Amino acid sequence: MKNYKSIICVVAAVCLLGTAAFCGFRIYHYYAEVDEQTETFEEIAEMVEQAPTDETVPDDAPVSEGEDVLAKYQKLYLQNEDMVGWISIAGTTINYPVMQSRNNPNFYLKHNFEKEYSYLGTPYVQENCDIAESDNLVIYGHHIKGGKMFGALEDYKSKSFYEEHKNIQFDTLTEQAEYEIVAVFKTVAYSSEGFRYYDFVDAENEEDFNSYVGKCKELALYDTGVTAEYGDRLIALSTCEYSAQNGRLVVVAKKVG
């Protein structure tokens, strides 16, 4: 009987050690990938910063590809034609390419710029948005601790942070543009109780547009003193918010230049 109990104890101990080792490996692997992908994004950003400012297409670039693309994004676009823009917020870690996969929604939720599986994913535009035409572009990014990816949006819960970071730079492949923040709010996704901000892409009319902006202002964590009018172009940056199940933190901004 004692031997039987001893065997059970040994087996239990081995199982616990195995589970601990497996969990430790998973955690190590996760943070190792976060560091690796962060470094890769930094290299991509450096490539953009060092790109020529001249708007002409390189002689070796295919005429049918990238001919209207801004010079600093041409090389990246030729590497991955799913790229539709670039987003950055001065004073934060947000400085990333923005992707869109119309035929495979949410593909970049778990894939990097090279289309390889990645915990961090890559910021991406909702599949039913038209980059050139839609009234509102919904852009998703993971909330990664340490302010990585769209984790930096967490700081916008503080009005004092907003006061120092009121603008967002969002460039399409063909145009550089600045956006002014209209509202920062929290909601719950996939719930009848939440605000389905992701359903608003193209306004049916002025009333529809004003209704969306009004709801954003109603839910806002604080008053920015900024609003949007029918005809303005909007972006909505969306990331996870952990105070509620399926919580979302959303930053809405309008194009100003």
Q: Which residue stretches match the model-derived regions?
A:
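N-terminal Sec-pathway targeting helices
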Residues: 1-16
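Solvent-exposed, non-transmembrane regions of membrane-associated and secreted proteins
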Residues: 20-257
